[in-house]
């Protein structure tokens, strides 16, 4: 996701983004010519929110001196800019919708678990943390798509039973019924899929996803990151 506020964000991170806030306030620079923000977690603090920024999408700089951005957030961070210009992401413990107007100060509102748990009636069972929900706002339709992964076989002890589901909403109050997101054919017909991130570029929808099949089943793509259009 590209923003034109990275210069401002770099400065804000130095004083306002974690429990370990520095005293004082540095001069805030004017807006720059843009860049990319990467919201992520770490192995050491799984589910926590960290930021990195890049001018070119290749070379990255850790923000906030490598500290957690918001200690209350737990999830798989995937930030989208919504209908009102604000930024949104979903947390899972507790299940909540987080909103920010500046990517620094975040507020949360609870989400109903049944948004995801209704998929049980279709034979998909939500996993711990509701399968890493991600979201994207489509300006053309005025809808948010929320995706997550669930298992089609609760007795499986691996990732082979995972499938990605989705719901649509315009207001975070009413939601469509959960549906399976991908209907691939051929060798990928029964692909196990998790962590699907959806974006739209030049009128084309892209999904960055994780193929969770065992390499013995899918030698060329098993346990790899793939892109679908």
PLM features: residue spans?
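Sec-dependent signal peptide recognition
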Residues: 1-7
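N-terminal Sec signal peptide cleavage junction
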Residues: 15-17
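Beta-rich carbohydrate-recognition and catalytic domains
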Residues: 23-130, 136-195, 199-229
